[in-house]
Design a protein with these regions (language model features):
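Active-site helical microenvironments for divalent-metal-assisted chemistry
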Residues: 1-216
Length: 216
């Protein structure tokens, strides 16, 4: 199991040295907000944003707003916190809002919402990078913790909705082109590795998302 204290200490030292004041506030806030929460496999929930932030640093992400968004991306949806009260600037609050999905009652409306959600990510660079890292981290854990159908749904969603948006983003955010390329490549490789384990379900979800995305 990942050592939360070591990850937290590493990030705090890096962020302090890099002068990332917003991310330092986000780091402390996220740890308190996620205190006591666990993932499906029993791992402390804070490991998820910490892992994402460490990966972002390794990729060369040096944007304070992006790292802070990564650390805070689940606190509104999972910790019952209000975005307007987060202790960070308005750019980060906006990005966290982009990362938060409104849920509906029917499966159809959920799919429509997801299509709209991914398309709108193109308007927010911080949320876009955060979502790519979020999806990579989640996909890596899915085969062991999700049903075959749930895993297939997320793989199809990634291929049909997220990867095309990341490709478009290279033109809009030229300074992030290298990072976007690495994220797209890694996500594609991971999807290709998982897909054979749930191919039948993946075919179903891929058709559903493609059909809905064509409408949007």
């Amino acid at each position: 199991m990942p050592n939360v204290e070591k990850m937290y200490t590493y990030l705090r030292g890096y962020l302090n040295g890099a002068g990332m004041s917003e991310s330092l506030k986000a780091l402390q806030y996220a740890r308190k907000a996620h205190d006591g929460q666990c993932r499906r496999d029993g791992t402390p929930y804070i490991v998820h944003p910490l892992s994402m932030a460490c990966y972002a640093v390794a990729l060369g992400v040096a944007d304070d707003n992006i790292i802070a968004t990564i650390l805070l991306h689940d606190v509104v949806e999972d910790c019952d916190r209000q975005v307007e009260y987060l202790p960070v600037n308005d750019t980060i609050k906006r990005a966290v809002k982009y990362m938060t999905i409104t849920t509906f009652d029917t499966d159809t409306s959920k799919i429509e919402t997801k299509c709209r959600y991914f398309n709108e990510l193109l308007d927010c660079r911080e949320a876009l990078i955060c979502k790519a890292l979020d999806r990579y981290n989640n996909l890596a854990d899915m085969p062991a913790n999700f049903t075959s159908d749930g895993t297939a749904k997320n793989v199809a969603e990634t291929e049909v909705l997220l990867l095309p948006i990341l490709k478009k983003a290279k033109e809009k955010y030229a300074d992030l082109a290298d990072i976007l390329f690495v994220l797209r490549t890694n996500l594609t490789t991971l999807c290709d590795a998982i897909k054979p384990q749930c191919y039948g379900e993946w075919t179903k979800w891929s058709c559903i998302y493609k059909r809905e995305d064509t409408k949007s």
